[in-house]
């Protein structure tokens, strides 16, 4: 069959001497302190008396001319009641995200193929389905803000809003 013989053997790698590892084998972390208080009761978490009436303030937005500012300021402060040690901070209610009368821009949120009811021509924003959280536009409308929605860009390769597929 083959008169050239066998393949040459490959030399073995030299054995590495054991050295100090680059990373420590075990990482010693301080132990977390044990909990001293019991968690709050379920009824205590959802009590609607955390924010005192009149304490929540919404910053006013003013522009040089109407429609000048489409974006909201990032830092908003909402005054809450006195902080108690038994109520976790995660359960404090937050004030309105969008101040009333502000304009919120939702880019690419409008689909030209979407229909919101029989003969709907103007932009009405439907409520979220049951069990689903509202999106940014629905939150803004619920809090009295104006919503500006730009059209989603579509082309031949990315698909349109007709719901069809092309198989090559």
From Swiss-Prot:
Modified residues (Phosphoserine): 77
Known partners and oligomeric status: Interacts with SOX6. Interacts with DAZ1 and DAZL. Interacts with IL17RB. May interact with FAM168B. Interacts with INCA1. Interacts with EIF4G1 and EIF4G2. Interacts (via PPAY motif) with NEDD4 (via WW domains). Interacts with transcription factor TCF4; the interaction results in localization of DAZAP2 to the nucleus. Interacts with transcription factors TCF7 and TCF7L1. Interacts with transcription factor LEF1.
Disulfide-bond pairs as recorded: none
Inducing stimuli: By serum stimulation.
UniProt-annotated location(s): Cytoplasm; Nucleus; Nucleus speckle; Nucleus, Nuclear body
Alphabetized InterPro entries for the sequence: DAZ_assoc-2 (IPR022730)
Keyword annotations: Cytoplasm, Nucleus, Phosphoprotein, Ubl conjugation
MF-aspect GO terms: DNA-binding transcription factor binding; identical protein binding; mitogen-activated protein kinase kinase kinase binding; p53 binding; protein serine/threonine kinase activator activity; protein serine/threonine kinase binding; receptor tyrosine kinase binding; ubiquitin protein ligase binding
Protein name per UniProt: DAZ-associated protein 2
Gene assigned in the entry: Dazap2
Coiled-coil features, chain-numbered ranges: none
Organism this protein belongs to: Mus musculus (Mouse)
Pfam families in the cross-refs: DAZAP2
